[in-house]
From Swiss-Prot:
Tagged with keyword Methyltransferase: yes
Keywords assigned: Flavonoid biosynthesis, Methyltransferase, S-adenosyl-L-methionine, Transferase
This protein's pathway: Secondary metabolite biosynthesis; flavonoid biosynthesis
InterPro entries the UniProt entry points to: Diverse_substrate_MTase, Methyltransf_25, SAM-dependent_MTases_sf
Official protein name in the record: Methyltransferase cfoB
Amino acid sequence: MATSNATDDLFASYDAEYWNTYLDARPTYSSDFYSIIFEHHAQKGSDSWALAHDVGTGPGNVAAVLAQRFEQVIATDASPDTVNAAQKRQQQTNKIRFAECKGENLALAGLSPPRTADLVANAEAIPLMDAEEAIGCFAELLAPGGTCAVWFYGRPKFAGPDTAVNEACQRIFYRISTRLLNKIGGVSGPLWERSTRTIASQLDNVAFPTAQWRDVVRYKWNCEQTTMLFHDESQFGGPVERVNCVGPAEEVVSKTDPGFWQMQWGAAEVRRWFEAHLPTWFEDKAEDLELEGWYEELDRVLGGKSLPVTWPVVLLLATRV
């Protein structure tokens, strides 16, 4: 989800119809996943359900779920076009208030009184933000006993029965990703470095100071012996720095579950995923023969069929002191 000026151009001028396509191409957050968040809030937090913030709302899909549990939801995004599209998509409820705001600036935006929110949700956006500033801002928004929920899913992982086929598909996925990134100049600059560091660290670089937070739990699905990065880091300057800010009192729950958010993907679904996640990079419809060759090779490896795809996912939960 767009949360800073550096990412506005990715989603500029994309309407509600585009966001429907985007949601179809990506994994769906399951009801069991949301239950983990809500149970944490009920058992370790205040169990108050008056106000929630959805930071980096994108198409408003998370805000819509929060509106089923909270009396009021404030959904924000740095992109005005994204906010307008989300408003159109979520017209079925009057419980969501949308506003344009950079995530790190929310505490100063006056959208809600300081330290009154019961939950702050931040889905798939923390790598685009200054994590230290963002977590500090969320602390200012939350009331004592309020819950911070930050999550991110990484690159898809092919999970069929044949390991050799899975590995071949993964290599082609990286080659497609590398080709697309090279077309826009590669992965470089301080914002890219910050983003890739957060993803490569599996969000372990997101710190929760004990003066502000308690009952920190880091859930990780399908993260062992894998990378969350969407590109092959060896193609862009070598290994990305991993940062670990996990505190000694924090709980880490690691799970391996190939069925977690599982989807079925063939070559067409891989193409749709890239085109949905990198929309403005496909505005030039001139055929890229190398790129088309990789899609054809992927379809050949798959035998024209599809494979199950799973996801490495990290969910951070913390309770405001």
